[in-house]
Amino acid sequence: MKAPDHLKHKPIIAVSDYDKIDGIYANQTDVRALSVGEAQWDNKEISVKIWRRPDERWSRQSEEIPLHRALDLSILTIASFITDIDAFYPQTSLREEIVQEGKVQKIKDYYTENEATLRPRLEELSKILDKFFAKKK
């Protein structure tokens, strides 16, 4: 299903039929599309949107996230995979902190259990970042 273009967030680039490739939730999700586009509250801003459609209407549960927050979530996610509770914190410019030291391993275990789905996405992220920075030189 295509991202709607008649709602307030205006997609510029979109992933249609995301429900078919949604990682461990593929074919079991109400997320129908992802997009990068004009933010719904300020068309001068760019945001990312997760489009949910559980029935015949687009859900108000669809999430719009400012672009910098989407990048920050990616940084935090990857940093959490390599977290060492004995290391000096923070590890990134986000100034993250360990809130539940006893559960850090749970994140690492989750990655290990889902590596077949997550690793290809991380590898693709690495490749696209390499291309991005190569063009900036």
Where are the regions a protein language model picked out?
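Charged/polar low-complexity intrinsically disordered segments, enriched in acidic residues
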Residues: 92-135
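Classical N-terminal secretory signal peptides
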Residues: 1, 134-137
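A short, structured beta-strand/loop element
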Residues: 28-64, 83-102
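Amphipathic, non-membrane alpha-helical segments in soluble helical-bundle scaffolds
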Residues: 63-70, 115, 119
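N-terminal "first-domain core" detector
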Residues: 1-33
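Elongated alpha-helical scaffolds
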Residues: 68-79
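Charged/polar positions within long, soluble alpha-helices
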Residues: 78, 82-89, 130, 134
